[in-house]
Every structure is written in structure tokens, then in C-alpha cells.
């Protein structure tokens, strides 16, 4: 599975739209879209926030699992 599909899959598991996850990260829907599709990179802070949102579903998940 490519990176884009992995990140979208995790977002869907959280039940969040691109707009809502963007809000969680403090960025616009367009900025989030650009990051999810690989046009721009997630910052380390954003990666950590996404990981922390996923911890309740996947207690052992790592940033590497999500983004690489």
C-alpha cells in the first residue's frame, strides 16, 4: 500500500474528513489535502499529533507505521 493510501486509510479509521483532521492539526483542508496526497510533507509536530489520535485504536502504532 502506498503512503497516500495508508494515511487516508488511517484518517478514515478515525472517522474524520480531510477538513476535520486539518482542523485537529491547525491547518486548512487544502493544506491537509496537499500533505495527504504527497504534494507537501507533514511536519514532525503534525505526524506526532496524528499518531496520538491513532493510539486509542492502535496502542503500539509508530510514526514509521503511518508515514513510511
Q: Language-model segments: what does each one mean?
A:
Residues 39-44:
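Short, solvent-exposed alpha-helical "recognition" segments
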Residues 1-13, 61:
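A short, Lys/Arg-rich alpha-helix, primarily the initiator
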Residues 11, 22, 51:
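The alpha-helix within a helix-turn-helix
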Residues 8, 19, 64:
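Residues within the helices of the helix-turn-helix
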Amino acid at each position: 500500500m502506498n503512503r497516500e493510501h495508508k494515511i487516508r486509510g488511517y484518517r478514515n479509521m478515525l472517522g474524520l474528513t480531510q477538513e476535520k483532521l486539518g482542523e485537529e492539526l491547525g491547518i486548512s483542508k487544502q493544506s491537509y489535502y496537499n500533505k495527504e496526497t504527497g504534494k507537501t510533507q507533514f511536519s514532525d509536530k503534525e505526524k506526532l499529533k496524528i499518531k496520538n489520535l491513532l493510539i486509542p485504536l492502535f496502542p503500539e502504532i509508530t510514526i514509521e507505521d503511518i508515514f513510511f
